[in-house]
Amino acid sequence: MSLKTFKPYTKSTRGTVLVDRSGLWKGKPFKLLTSVNNASKGRNNQGRITSRNHGGGHKQKYRTVDFYRRKFDSIAEIERIEYDPNRSCHIMLVKFEDEKKFYYLAPQKIKIGDKIQNGSNIEIKVGNCMPLQDIPVGIDIHNVELQPGAGGKIARSAGTSVNITGVDGNYSLVKMASGEVRKINSRCMATIGVLSNPDKKNIKIGKAGRSRWLGIRPHTRGVVKNPVDHPHGGGEGKTAGGRHPVSPTGQSAKGLKTRDNKRTDKFIIRRRKGKKK
């Protein structure tokens, strides 16, 4: 995939940079693997806003992607590579020898007609899915399970991958993109390769309307609100807020550590490093 630029015929095309999807499937998604996508629009079951600035957006159908990859002892052929509005990377429709079809996450360097497999003792090849214990050190992988049989949880976004750096007994040492090194059970499944659409990070939306198509609503700064609406609100004239940046509920917005999961701390070998400013 490459990037697509536009001539500045209008204000909305000036500076716009999008991903070129000309090489993707142009038809409708596979009907048996789609369902209605009833997005919550940032509301909970009581209708109250729990995630601000979400709502609207173009109507979408949810593509049921198989993150488990548990169909073994069969070879699948890639029928097509598709755009998925529900995630940043592309997906691929594969057909197995018994005619069953699945949606999988599409890695880079894969093309229509390629053959892929799931299971143990198979070829180290882009698109193949196997246990961590069968993957050599230094290979890029994605869609990694945290618990055997629980389905892929790590490295599922566009252009992402993680790397096996070593082995410790029944565990593999996996280095995340953040720099964190984590112990994962060697029986967990992972897929070879780096995920597709790495240029996603380089796009420029170009206009407010495209954000609304994506379901992103306008964001209002707290400092311009009233005191009843935000801790930074109020003041005579233009003020700087008068306190350290916080969220509308008063939680620090600058580097407060919110992780509280002592149960899995023992699996983290090295913490991620913060970016130097």
At which residue positions do the language-model features occur?
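Basic, glycine/proline-rich low-complexity segments that contact nucleic acids
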Residues: 1-87, 108-277
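Structural recognition of beta-strand segments within beta-rich domains
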Residues: 86, 94-96
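Beta-strand/loop nucleic-acid-binding surfaces
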Residues: 99-111
